[in-house]
């Protein structure tokens, strides 16, 4: 794809213009996702946020817009915002990758809290997300949920728990 050919700033600008022109004629979710991601990758965070907001104004139930918005917030370590937006995407359409991102955000939020009860609650919520991701994508073709689920089981139940052992990446 065009993005794979970007090696210089000029390549990036050309690719961006090409995607903007494509999007002007084709508002498909694929083009939207590529353009929104490209804005983020090029450090154009404000443009990315505006672009996503415009899409959500047109279609408040756009799974892709909520997922891309949540991913951008996750990449910026904005855990609460990412969790809220990824939950919206998941409500619209349950998706293994979105559920895995939710688990990742919750794990990071748990790691940054000193309150053991809050950590346990976050990890329990993470467990539910990742188990649903496992159910939707047992072969991990969409999302690599296994290690996160292993880590979650390990933190909740310890190394000797059968769930932890079953997810241990060394025991494939």
What are these regions (language model features)?
Residues 3-9, 41-43, 75-77, 103, ...:
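Short coil/turn linking the two alpha-helices of tandem helical-hairpin repeats
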Residues 16-19, 52, 79, 86, ...:
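Hydrophobic/aromatic packing residues within the alpha-helices of TPR/SEL1-like helical repeat arrays
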Residues 24-27, 60, 93-94, 138-140:
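Short coil turns that delineate tetratricopeptide repeat
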Residues 29-30, 63-64, 96-98, 141-143:
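Helix-start (N-cap) detector for alpha-helical repeat units in TPR-like alpha-solenoids
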Residues 124, 132-172:
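Terminal, low-structured helical/coil segments at or just beyond the last alpha-helical repeat
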